Amino acid sequence: MIISAASDYRAAAQRILPPFLFHYIDGGAYAEYTLRRNVEDLSEVALRQRVLKNMSDLSLETTLFNEKLSMPVALAPVGLCGMYARRGEVQAAAAADAKGIPFTLSTVSVCPIEEVAPTIKRPMWFQLYVLRDRGFMRNALERAKAAGCSTLVFTVDMPTPGARYRDAHSGMSGPNAALRRYWQAATHPQWAWDVGLNGRPHDLGNISAYLGKPTGLEDYIGWLANNFDPSISWKDLEWIREFWDGPMVIKGILDPEDARDAVRFGADGIVVSNHGGRQLDGVLSSARALPAIADAVKGDIAILADSGIRNGLDVVRMIALGADSVLLGRAYLYALATAGQAGVANLLDLIEKEMKVAMTLTGAKSISEISRDSLVQELGKSLPAALAPLTQGDAA
């Protein structure tokens, strides 16, 4: 199969992966409206072409939390990453490290912190949920710090799991789910050999290390369902600061008021995110929410964005809308499932090339030169009408 874009990796991953795993990453919440709008809204952002600008000295390098990045991209935290390729977190981290960008390890990774961190040169980032078991949270923070993790990504948009209807149909949950998963594994031999047999143990390493026993998929579902904490509040940031003194990024911001609160409570960064359309269906796409948030807090806090990014043009669009950097999630997981570390490395090369084309043809020689001036102005506005926030009159 010819691979020329992230969409090719998605098609390849669908053939390789058992359906329960493919649809777990590919699907969203409820009717998946927000999942679709994430991609569609971003694709509607029109770039402003500029020519004859002498673009021979173009650079994608940037700095974030005192870390030098080869381009404004980090790999997002993705749960169960190690089920998509043999020791998947290790392979993805190696690809990010070689490219000179951060890798973020999920709380619910297959490979534990202690397995991934020693395999790469640059410090990785660590993602944490707010859970009822504060002992686990403290344990995870202490282990992340001991392993040299540089930045904490604190996910706040999951006080309760979203309703993901695809999971019941695909075998991730629902009647006879375990039996259906075994059958799917048996009928997908490439995955069964690479991951099913040779990628063991298939437990959640960070949780197993704390509980002192293996955690299989059923344990994962049950433990998380019992531990998500709806009492989460801004005060939890103060508690986390008792155990974490490095940069802290709040992931799951969609409203300017929440962004201002993040500044007020001492966060170092935010991620404008709707969890990839996997939590509350019907909320704004990240592309549509980002401009107002940037207007509210740009310069006061680092702004990252995710959800809907599929190529290098999308990275440039997000930065033009107000982000300092982006997190890449689904796109890299498709590549990982297709070709492991080499797939992720190739995807990052593709994104880099696409960014260079977009920057060359919009006249931006550096990341700092990408702004709303890089977008086509319509009707006297700096943003396309399709992305203008709804007013009460519009909603009516």
UniProtKB/Swiss-Prot annotation:
EC category: oxidoreductase
Similarity remark: Belongs to the FMN-dependent alpha-hydroxy acid dehydrogenase family.
Species this chain originates from: Citrobacter koseri (strain ATCC BAA-895 / CDC 4225-83 / SGSC4696)
Keyword Membrane belongs to the record: yes
Residues noted as binding FMN in the record, renumbered to the chain: 106, 127, 155, 251, 306-330
Keywords: Cell inner membrane, Cell membrane, Flavoprotein, FMN, Membrane, Oxidoreductase
GO BP annotation list: aerobic respiration; lactate metabolic process
Residues annotated as the enzyme's active site: H275
Principal location: membrane
Keyword Cell inner membrane attributed: yes
Function noted in UniProt: Catalyzes the conversion of L-lactate to pyruvate. Is coupled to the respiratory chain.
Localization of this protein: Cell inner membrane
Protein name (Swiss-Prot/TrEMBL): L-lactate dehydrogenase
Required co-factors: FMN
Domain FMN hydroxy acid dehydrogenase positions: 1-380
Pfam families (UniProt xref): FMN_dh
Membrane topology qualifier: Peripheral membrane protein
Binding site for substrate: Y24, Y129, R164, R278
GO CC term, one of those recorded: plasma membrane
Catalytic activity of the protein: (S)-lactate + A = pyruvate + AH2
Enzyme Commission code: 1.1.-.-
